[in-house]
Amino acid sequence: MKHEYEIIGIFIRKPDIAYDEVQKLMTGFGCIVRTRLGINREELGGGIIIVDITGDEEQKQLFRSKLAALEGVEVQEMIF
C-alpha cells in the first residue's frame, strides 16, 4: 500500500554540531522533500523540523538513515 503522507520529525538537540549537516541533507534530498517547517525551541537548546517526504522508497529510507546517523539528531516518523 502506498502511503499518502510520510512525515519525518527531526529534533536537533545539538544545533551547533548538527545544523549544517542537516541543512546539507535537506538540500541534497530536496527532490523528495515536499514541505518543511522549522520550529525553534531555544528553551530546549535546539529545534524541530517537520518534513513531508514523497517519491522513491529507497531515497526516502536513505534520507532517514543519514539523518538518524548524525550526532545530536533524533528522527521520528508518522505515516498515514
Predicted regions and their residues:
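Long, contiguous binding/interaction regions
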Residues: 1-80
